[in-house]
Amino acid sequence: MEWSPVAKVYDPLKAGSIDGTDVEPHDAGVWRAMLARYKPNRGVCGDPDLTLFVARLNPQTTEEKLRDVFSKFGDIRRLRLVRDVVTGFSKRYAFIEYKEERSLKRAWRDANKLILDQYELLVDVEQERTLPGWRPRRLGGGQGGQKESGQLRFGGRDRPFRKPINLSTRRPAEPRGRETERERDRRDYRDRRHERTHTEDRTHRHTY
């Protein structure tokens, strides 16, 4: 399979690994995500292929401010700032659905790491309905995260996979007891150098 810095299918075990090569989970969250069964929320409206995920918002940022900023990239069909159902406080992330794909692509390209109300935004495509096998953060999955949490997840825009070291690309080892071409070259060079030095010494002795 061709290597990619972003996941095409969500695998909790790979998401917990910086290069996607772990064979055992390294934290309890990965275990929880591997055992979890998750189905996308059917109550979510809109076209997932035209929807952006906007995270790391200032808790004070409002729907109106988001609409004002993101409408500069194109016409918005829907905007939902996710809030706590009890307190009404912002959960610091939102979903924005555009009317056209070119608007989504423009916002995806230009709005990521944009500073809004003194906070740097993370902007990516929606994953819940577009990435097969998706597990949300509350089940131990998700993507990104902060080092302090101890549960970093890789394979997304925020923390893409690092390309693993491919040991198969190394030169095959020569069989033991067999002189390599490089070793022969070195030996020949030493022999020639020794012979030349020995000849020069004899010449000097004869000269005197």
Swiss-Prot record:
PANTHER family: U1 SMALL NUCLEAR RIBONUCLEOPROTEIN 70 KD, U11_U12 SMALL NUCLEAR RIBONUCLEOPROTEIN 35 KDA PROTEIN
Segments for region (Disordered): 133-208
Alphabetical keyword list: Nucleus, RNA-binding
GO molecular function: mRNA binding; snRNA binding
GO biological process: mRNA splicing, via spliceosome
UniProt feature, compositional bias: Basic and acidic residues: 171-208
Domain RRM: 50-128
Phylogenetic placement of the source organism: Eukaryota, Metazoa, Chordata, Craniata, Vertebrata
Protein name: U11/U12 small nuclear ribonucleoprotein 35 kDa protein
Gene Ontology CC annotation, any one: U12-type spliceosomal complex
Record gene name: snrnp35
Pfam entry (one): RRM_1
Record localization: Nucleus
CDD domains reported for this sequence: RRM_snRNP35
